[in-house]
């Protein structure tokens, strides 16, 4: 759907009118925003990160990973959309969930990531591993809000699992944060 989704087309029209722009200018901005948000999922990137994490992180940090309840999730995923809402105490949170799912033959989720993580090299790798980026604030930009909403709606409609962190950001102390 992208910029052709009804909600986005309406927001483009509103943007063009409110900012005295042509439809072409507003549509161009909508495409830039869609590119800013969207993941660019790549099996090769997932395989690369899996090998890297196995060799240099998981086998050195953990003695093992105790996974419980995955069969129930696998069963639910056959007929329901899955949204994971883990706590976010460290960077390991999103990496570990995707790693476990991948190793158990399930597709890792698309992960909502703060726009601050969209930096050179790291941002591209995260995007290819399923991260989609979101700004901390949506206020004052109806076009961005429409693009983001349309993107998440499309992921859900296509049956992709999504991972959001209710706290909004990673804890700096290791303690759970209040949801935002």
Please report, for each region that a protein language model flagged, where it lies by residue:
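Membrane-interfacial terminal anchoring regions of lipid-handling membrane enzymes
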Residues: 1-163, 168-180
């Amino acid at each position: 759907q992208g910029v052709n989704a009804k909600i986005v087309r309406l927001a483009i029209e509103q943007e063009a009118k409110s900012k005295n722009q042509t439809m072409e200018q507003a549509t161009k901005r909508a495409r830039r925003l869609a590119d800013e948000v969207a993941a660019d999922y790549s099996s090769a990137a997932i395989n690369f990160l899996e090998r890297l994490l196995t060799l240099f992180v998981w086998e050195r940090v953990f003695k093992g990973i105790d996974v419980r309840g995955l069969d129930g999730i696998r069963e639910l995923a056959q007929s329901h959309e899955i949204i994971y809402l883990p706590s976010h105490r460290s960077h390991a949170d999103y990496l570990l969930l995707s790693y476990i799912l991948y190793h158990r033959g399930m597709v890792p989720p698309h992960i909502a990531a703060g726009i601050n993580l969209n930096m050179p090299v790291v941002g591209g790798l995260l995007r290819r591993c399923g991260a989609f980026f979101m700004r901390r604030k949506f206020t004052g930009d109806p076009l961005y809000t429409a693009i983001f909403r349309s993107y998440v709606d499309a992921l859900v409609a296509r049956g992709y699992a999504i991972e959001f962190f209710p706290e909004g950001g990673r804890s700096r102390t290791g303690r759970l944060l209040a949801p935002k």
